Amino acid sequence: MKQQNNDGDQLQSFCTNEGIQITDEQHQLLVRYAQMLESWNTKVNLISRKEDAPVLIRHVFHSLLPSLVHNFRDGETVLDLGTGGGLPGIPLAIMYPQVQFLLVDSTGKKITACSAMIEELGLTNARAMHTRVEELKGLAFNTILSRQVAPLKELSRYAAPLLKKNGELICLKGGDLQKEIDEALREGKKRKGFPGSVTLKPIGEVSPLFNEKQIVIARWR
């Protein structure tokens, strides 16, 4: 219990430092979600089982960082592409109750876990769907999010048909990204469906846990 309290205090401190406004209720829900994520992870492989840092910080707080580069607006529609255990969709749904989130994953067990956690948290602005992104038809989103390790070129190909005009693809990624960014931009010069610009925001200054981590913002012309 003491460790959980310490992690909760650290979450509050990080949010304050980054200018992320968080209510007591949201804080409690984020802490509860981290607990559920760890519990479900013993049954379904949602996150690494060899964590060297608190799940509440490494995964849950990390999932809030797109708010540093994107203003989530009331009524906005957001797709979480390859959500896994609900990351980043569930933490952001907690923070932005007036934004609608659709979480998709091709692994049924992960979606079962996400749906159960969404229900237990009482989130009415998020739902989880077992499907492949290629099978999403007739839907359009203001913003698409992903924590997947897939190259930006591949994620862009999935995202483009599902983005509304002036939409953004926001990815939480790590490592040396220049090669995959260059590949995506080259495709953008040759054909539609790829971003016209890509911006990077390093987040290592937020915490050493996120050294070599960056937020990738891909925009379509």
UniProtKB/Swiss-Prot annotation:
The molecule here is called: Ribosomal RNA small subunit methyltransferase G
Which amino acid positions bind S-adenosyl-L-methionine, per UniProt?
Answer: 82, 87, 105-107, 133-134, 147
Source organism = Chlorobium phaeovibrioides (strain DSM 265 / 1930) (Prosthecochloris vibrioformis (strain DSM 265))
- Transmembrane ranges, per UniProt, are none
Identify the HAMAP family for this entry.
16SrRNA_methyltr_G
The coding gene here is rsmG
EC number per UniProt: 2.1.1.-
Q: Name one GO molecular function term.
A: rRNA (guanine-N7-)-methyltransferase activity
Q: Where is it located?
A: Cytoplasm
Which protein family is it in?
Belongs to the methyltransferase superfamily. RNA methyltransferase RsmG family.
Q: Name one GO cellular component term.
A: cytosol
Instruction: Please spell out the taxonomic lineage of the organism that makes this protein.
Output: Bacteria, Pseudomonadati, Chlorobiota, Chlorobiia, Chlorobiales
The answer, when asked if rRNA processing is one of the entry's keywords, is: yes
> Which keywords annotate this record?
Cytoplasm, Methyltransferase, rRNA processing, S-adenosyl-L-methionine, Transferase
Q: Which Pfam families match?
A: GidB (PF02527)
What role is this protein assigned?
A: Specifically methylates the N7 position of a guanine in 16S rRNA.
